[in-house]
Regions:
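Short acidic-hydrophobic catalytic motif
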Residues: 95
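A structural signal for well-ordered alpha-helical segments within the folded catalytic domains
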Residues: 16-19, 104-108, 198-206
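N-terminal anchoring/stem segment of glycosyltransferases
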Residues: 1-92, 115-118, 169-172, 247-254, ...
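Conserved catalytic core of nucleotide-sugar-dependent glycosyltransferases
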Residues: 132-201
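Short beta-alpha junction loops
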Residues: 39-44, 129, 155-156
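GT-A fold catalytic core of metal-dependent nucleotide-sugar glycosyltransferases
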Residues: 98, 102-152
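Catalytic core and acceptor-binding pocket of nucleotide-sugar-dependent glycosyltransferases
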Residues: 170-274
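Short, well-ordered beta-to-alpha junction loops that form the rim of enzyme active sites
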Residues: 41, 127, 223-225
């Protein structure tokens, strides 16, 4: 089974965490797993032949078109529309929930990789990930069961954690999910903007619900097991935490998840105990 990891970042974060992600991937992830990285206005450095660095602006024309159409439209850039604001008095000010343009960088990288990678699985991994321990092929593959069409981080009733997910490109349901996922972005006015929120995780969840209704018996691997407590930081509290850290929010400036409530599951890996 072949596996290709996909990620993207832009110039402002290269020195903060982007280059560190590339270095940790090269050092700790099995040599049989590839990385396809879309870099925007920056030049990450690596001598690792399995890491392919692409110019995001050149390789993602659909993303460019999306930004051209929606880049100056307030509702697509974090400004909650009045009709939603009226029924969301507690969270309308949380701009990330309606910032479609910001999070489109992630999804269009996935769409492009799915079309151009000759691989069995594509795995999205946020670039604010740090691979802290050796992650061999068998361990990585264990999160991607061959019979499953999707591996993801569920959070119960909340939208999934989309810092890590895998799609089986050899499974027709996985391909249908990708097709629908891209469709709601390519036809955004009647797609994502008909939803209640339009950050990538919410859109992912809406498409996932639709596909699950259509194929209720097709296997999916929920890596997190629907964590109820600590659902804000599920990656490090799942099996993935033995290998990677996810530097969400202001953890990026610290370089490690070290908040008191980050780990709800005791870990004995040296990265976490030192």
């Amino acid at each position: 089974m072949t596996i290709t990891v996909v990620s993207t970042f832009h110039a402002p974060v290269l020195s903060l965490y982007g280059q560190r992600f590339v270095n940790s991937f090269s050092e700790n992830i099995d040599a049989d797993i590839k990385l396809r990285l879309y870099a925007e206005d920056c030049n990450p450095v690596t001598k690792d032949p399995r890491i392919q660095i692409l110019d995001a602006k050149q390789k993602l024309p659909k993303l460019n078109a999306f930004k051209s159409t929606w880049g100056n439209v307030p509702k697509a850039n974090g400004k909650c529309p009045p009709e939603i604001k009226a029924r969301r008095p507690k969270d309308w000010h949380k701009e990330f929930k309606w910032d479609a343009v910001r999070f489109a960088n992630k999804v269009y990288a996935v769409f492009d990789a799915a079309q151009h990678c000759n691989t069995d699985w594509i795995v999205w991994m946020d670039a604010d990930t740090f691979v802290h321990s050796k992650f061999d092929y068998a361990a990585f593959k264990s999160f991607l069961p061959e019979r499953s069409w999707l591996a993801y981080m569920g959070r119960g009733r909340k939208w999934p954690e989309c810092g890590f997910y895998g799609i089986n490109l050899k499974n027709p349901v996985g391909l249908e999910f990708l097709k629908e996922f891209e469709h709601v972005y390519e036809h955004a006015e009647y797609g994502i903007f008909r939803m209640e929120e339009w950050h990538d995780s919410y859109v992912f969840d809406e498409v996932l619900k639709k596909i699950k209704r259509k194929y209720p018996n097709e296997p999916i691997n929920n890596i997190s097991g629907n964590l109820v407590n600590g659902e804000g930081h599920p990656i490090i509290n799942s099996g993935l935490g033995a290998y990677i850290d996810h530097l969400k929010g202001d953890r990026k400036s610290v370089g490690k998840s070290n908040k008191p409530k980050d780990l709800i599951k005791p870990r004995n890996e040296s990265y976490w105990t030192n």
